[in-house]
From Swiss-Prot:
Classification via SUPFAM superfamilies: Prokaryotic type KH domain (KH-domain type II), Ribosomal protein S3 C-terminal domain
Recorded name of the encoding gene: rpsC
The protein, known as: Small ribosomal subunit protein uS3
Keyword Ribonucleoprotein: yes
Domain (KH type-2): residue spans on this chain: 38-106
Domain of life: Bacteria
Keywords: Ribonucleoprotein, Ribosomal protein, RNA-binding, rRNA-binding
Organism: Latilactobacillus sakei subsp. sakei (strain 23K)
CDD domains hit by this protein: KH-II_30S_S3 (cd02412)
PANTHER family from the UniProt entry: 30S/40S RIBOSOMAL PROTEIN S3, SMALL RIBOSOMAL SUBUNIT PROTEIN US3C
GO MF, one example: rRNA binding
PROSITE patterns (UniProt xref): KH_TYPE_2, RIBOSOMAL_S3
Length: 219
């Protein structure tokens, strides 16, 4: 069943942290819907800015949003104009004070969402799916990945019956919890319908941080 579980959720609390860092009792549903609105707005507004992860933190009446992107210049804009417009829009959307932090992705070829999104955009441009997968895997391996697996599902090449094509290079140890595996699921809108693109990238092992236990002799 290790092939079925979401690799990101499987590693939360071991080597991964939550993308939403807040706690609420009575307002949980309200905050959750607010998070979904924020993520949907950012992903729509910055569709061409290679945005990967969006982290949301909350403190009192303040919302801190960290946007991980491969194109920080496009998000920030000339003199910070674009990010300021985005901040104002999120302020109006949530009715709270929003602070935006831009985090640059140094190696976009090691980010599963950006790689999967690249494959999806190629499929929409009618590039052969095997070629799109092969080129993406080669770029990722050259960038320093230990392994990559890509899966494309749907009416490939407009076939009447949908099928799944999986290609892999290197190793992708899904059962090893200390393995840093980035996972993403993306969609390609083609003339024959939607194609699903799944991407797993193994970036090496991460040793979980051990808790410091300084107690001695029953103290």
């Amino acid at each position: 069943m290790g092939q079925k579980i979401n690799p990101t959720g499987f590693r939360v609390g071991v080597i991964r942290d939550w993308d939403a860092k807040w706690y609420a009792e009575k307002d949980f549903a309200t905050f959750l819907h607010e998070d979904l609105k924020i993520r949907k707005y950012i992903n729509t507004k910055l569709a061409d800015a290679s945005v990967s992860t969006i982290e949301i933190e909350r403190a009192a009446n303040r919302v801190n949003v960290s946007i991980h992107t491969a194109k920080p210049g496009m998000v920030i804009g000339k003199g910070g104009s674009e990010v300021e417009n985005l901040r104002k829009a999120l302020n109006n959307l949530t009715g709270k004070k929003v602070h935006i932090n831009i985090v640059e992705i140094k190696k976009p070829d090691l980010d599963a969402h950006l790689v999967g999104e690249g494959i999806a955009r190629q499929l929409e441009a009618r590039v052969a799916f095997r070629r799109a997968q092969r080129q993406a895997m080669q770029r990722t391996m050259r960038a320093g990945a230990k392994g990559i697996k890509t899966q494309v599902a749907g009416r490939l090449n407009g076939a009447d019956m949908s099928r799944i094509e999986t290609h892999a290079q290197g190793t992708v140890p899904l059962h090893t919890l200390r393995a840093d595996i980035d996972y993403s699921w993306d969609e390609a809108m083609t003339t024959y319908g939607k194609l699903g693109v799944k991407t797993w990238i193994y970036r090496g092992e991460v040793l979980p941080a051990k808790a410091n236990n300084n107690t001695k002799g029953g103290k």
